[in-house]
Amino acid sequence: MVLVDTGVWIDFLAGRSTPEVSLVVSLLEEKETISYTGQILQELMQGCSDENDAKTIEVHFEPFIELFPQRSSYRLAAKIYRDCRKQGYTIRSSVDCLIAACAIENNCQVHHKDRDFKFIEKVCGLKILRK
């Protein structure tokens, strides 16, 4: 299962041609199981200019698996943040720590374009999709 992060979805939905978008297209064509968190959906929907665009995004995400943070996810997210900080990496968004925690707990690879996930991988063993 692959968790696709917000930045990649933004480029995908905008029709941009990037290596990350090409990989999402391949994942969809290969019928790979794709997941997301509510935080990712929220970030995408809050960037919409109107309710119709937000609803369109919701509909696009219906076939994917939503990962729900558990109590343990929040604890792990806090630990991820602390562990990264101890190693000299300040994660810019605690949301990224929560997304990483959900991915770790659900044994997902993360497909991203955000440097914070590289730091989390280095310190905490987050699985990053590479193809």
For each feature predicted by the language model, list its residue ranges:
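A generic structural signal for short hydrophobic patches within well-formed alpha-helices
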Residues: 9-10, 41-44, 117
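Histidine- and aromatic-rich ligand-binding microenvironments
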Residues: 5, 37, 92-93, 114, ...
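Generic structural signal for small/hydrophobic residues in well-ordered secondary structure
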Residues: 5-6, 44, 77, 103
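Short, hinge-like loop/turn segments at secondary-structure boundaries
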Residues: 51-55, 84-85, 127-131
